[in-house]
Amino acid sequence: MAHKKAGGSTNNGRDSVSKRLGVKRFGGQVVLAGNILVRQRGTKFHPGTNVRKGKDDTLFATMDGRVVFSKKGKFMYQYISIEIT
């Protein structure tokens, strides 16, 4: 009797869709109010002047201008600001 036993199951075989996180507008780029600057989980980047933080920690511009990255404070946090041109 030619029988083949059932193959064992595997724990692999699935993958989640990427969330497309990261910096969307880089230093020196000109942006419009409402443009998304960074998509992030947590606050790797903190909002500086003319930048606000959304409920999912996304940083977005509140004014038209040029993107500026800087590090400030005791712990050298990274801030993103908009310099009005």
From Swiss-Prot:
GO biological process, alphabetically ordered: translation
Keyword Ribonucleoprotein: yes
A GO molecular-function annotation: structural constituent of ribosome
InterPro entries in alphabetical order: Ribosomal_bL27, Ribosomal_bL27_CS
Cellular component per GO, a single term: cytosolic large ribosomal subunit
UniProt keyword terms in alphabetical order: Ribonucleoprotein, Ribosomal protein
PROSITE patterns tied to this protein: RIBOSOMAL_L27
Keyword NAD: no
Family designation: Belongs to the bacterial ribosomal protein bL27 family.
Protein name: Large ribosomal subunit protein bL27
Species the sequence originates in: Vesicomyosocius okutanii subsp. Calyptogena okutanii (strain HA)
Lineage, highest ranks first: Bacteria, Pseudomonadati, Pseudomonadota, Gammaproteobacteria, Candidatus Pseudothioglobaceae
